[in-house]
Amino acid sequence: MQHKLVCFIGGGNMAQAIVFGLLKQAYPADKIIVCDPNEEKRALFAQKGVRTSTDNVAAVSQAEVVLLAVKPQVLAEVCSPLSAVDFSDKLLISIAAGISVKRLTALLPTAKAVVRVMPNTPALVGEGMAGLFADQNTSENDRTFAQDLLSAVGKTLWVASEEHMHAVTAASGSSPAYFFQFLEAMQQSLIDMGLSANNARELVQQAMLGSAKMVVENPQLDLSTLRQNVTSKGGTTAAALNVLNQHQFNDIVQQAMQACVARSKEMETLF
């Protein structure tokens, strides 16, 4: 991986995950600048030898790569002073949810190489899944750098059409919360059966972890086969799945993901 000077605008959880992931891969700390108005966040990075600043314009001006790691609702405000900076020879990466490449180039008109990224919170433990999109103005070299950057905290996947970023949002960006809610419901059910909260959590989290590992380590088996392999006719698993199916579980999941996509599309028009 090339060691370009990268400036992070925003030092929140996702920026922290990426920066610390890069440092674990021996990326030079002095090649990273993090801009954030919060003194405690800056101190967190400074302890690792990372350069910090409160002057976004000065930091961005010297950077080769700029990563926007702020909430979509404040992106326009953050980008306003940055529009005076010449981005023509810089790689611009955005992890702001629902912000299109077209919108980014409208906010920063001189930007040529732009990569839109949809990461997810498992990046905080090095198990992220990030969807990436770049238009034809972004070189192969810039694409490779963006991919290497996000690979520091998990896996990456390029989509050919920006429209597919909405599906990526539903599939990985938001989906950790779906899994958490399912685990939460299972845990509460076990508590209602008399188990302690700790025991209930240990049972459900290990079941989820083991199931995910079975999926990863058996790529030759489709998901329905894995499910069927656990489900004996007339058994306990079948009884549980029958209840889920009676309540149209698959339809509920599809409706939830479609709602996520609809909101993602709506956000493109809001910010």
Spans of model-derived segments:
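Small-residue helix-packing motif on alpha-helices
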Residues: 32, 42, 59, 196-204, ...
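Rossmann-like NAD(P)(H) cofactor-binding subdomain of soluble oxidoreductases
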Residues: 33, 39, 48, 56-61, ...
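NAD(P)-dependent Rossmann-like dehydrogenase/reductase catalytic/cofactor-binding core
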Residues: 2, 205, 209-271
